[in-house]
């Protein structure tokens, strides 16, 4: 079963009528076998759909238009089995609005040395057919992914899956609606941004709603539904006897369950995939949602604290991209440092860290929250599982958006955190904290990020290219002088590409 049940990527093979019916029959047969192989492979998470070989400008234009209008198609894979004169592709590529990958492969892995003849050469000539197609892509300034190698190779299939996941994320971005309850945290700069520019570039919509509208949805929740929700909590988390046995804590938990159900109903009925709130805008609320927000993220919603709609969008997009993969994705904040033999960052937030990143079964507890509405708030406590991860931040620079990515290694804390009443993750940034933090600050990265152990750097690279957005990467090879030069060069490039 593919992780993406209703999404598809179309496989389109280019050729021409020059070669005659026998060669074209072989081209079609080989293409169908490749598609079958992709669909049988557990390495590729999206259904690949075979499309008949295109041999003329009219056929190419028609299939590109069909891909554009198909709601389930998130992108197309293009392969030139034979030579397909690239002028035939101009109208179709001009029309194509879905992302496309250029797969540079051939059906047979090895040459049949003792049998090869000109018929074989004319049939299996992607080595130069794909170069012709590559030229027109470059000439038309088309952003695309190029994957090279035999189609049965595990590395090739991994690259295809990365791109397919990015295409699914891009499709989600084009259709995403984000609900904002309240505004940004007062006086904070980085969470601000141009929502119109974001919708033009990324596709997602951001809409604001009053706390009154949300409170009405919460008030409509039946007490029987609240009781059923508490039963779910008891079965899914570690819950001490004192929580359900204490009348006050139980009341706080019932209020939190009602918030969760009301939020879920509001977001679902409105077609929203992500939301934000702010501890400074909680009029009429019984508290800042803690457990409620954590569970909504665990169920796939994006979230951004203090009105951070850009991070909320990226959390949702990355959750979609990571479907079916081990690891999780969460809203996160760089909170405090551990300077020592290896410098580390303790990431957390007031309450809202997604349990999809937990190393063990989370504990459900009620603790005092002292920012905004001061009250006792139920929340899940855990530490993030060890392993490679990334932090991704999207910022608005005025004339463009920049995505910043830092590769990390999440580690197990050397000691317990008995007095920390929030979920957290401890990580070591690559190449080290000194370089990573300096580069992040030079790039203007936010204190919020989308943290993930399910998503790879390559997937974010593919997504950023689909969006036409600037991406800077902080990894094991980063050096500050080179990184600062990259930022300067990017400023010139994007200024010329889009206008100052």
Curated annotation (Swiss-Prot):
* Keyword Signal attached: no
GO BP term, pick one: L-arabinose catabolic process to xylulose 5-phosphate
**What EC number(s) does this enzyme carry?**
5.3.1.4
What InterPro entries does this protein map onto?
Answer: Ara_Isoase_C, AraA_central, AraA_N, AraA_N_sf, Fuc/Ara_isomerase_C, Fucose_isomerase_N/cen_sf, Lara_isomerase
The coenzyme or cofactor needed here is:
Mn(2+)
> What are the record's GO terms for cellular component?
cytosol
Q: Where does Mn(2+) bind?
A: 306, 333, 349, 448
| Assigned protein family | Belongs to the arabinose isomerase family.
- Function in brief: Catalyzes the conversion of L-arabinose to L-ribulose.
Listed name of the protein:
L-arabinose isomerase
